């Protein structure tokens, strides 16, 4: 009888221990789900704030009465939206190297300025020139650059901010070119190139970064084609959108 009672007690204790482990695991899972849901909610709020930064920049660019005029030279402008702190910049695509129009030598120079070795830059340039020379469809999205021989993830990350598909220029407009491009291609300084008086064109890139009080950050990069209209039509068309 005592042996049976001992076995029964062990079974009860084992059951209680198992239930405790299950309940502990369930509680931990619920806490993890709650943290993930809270982070997702805050990240969505930060992303919406970043989108608001894009809208504010577009409004300033399109409104000819806006003073001071928002220059498309890549400078970072601090803004506030509700509780979020924003950092927004506008860049003209005219100041970037057009992959579909640039010369082979210019592409090599820019790739090397971004850290590529000479041989790596040559492979990249030859692959792009061969594609364009054979009558294939020109690059339609910047991400296609990743597929070319000689391209690495590190090199792509360095080159992407300095290249475009929408300027149509054989060389970047020095008035809007980055210091890296001006140095690599021997372009004149922004002051000598016209600076604030230069035409930024109709294709702009907007980079918006939002940070909430809790530290959650979200970023948004978009390229838009401006099409000012006095009617109800949207005054711009999105060419590229990356969160």
Pin down the residues of each PLM region.
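N-terminal leader/signal peptides at the extreme start of proteins
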Residues: 1-5
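Compositionally biased linear targeting/interaction segments
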Residues: 7-243
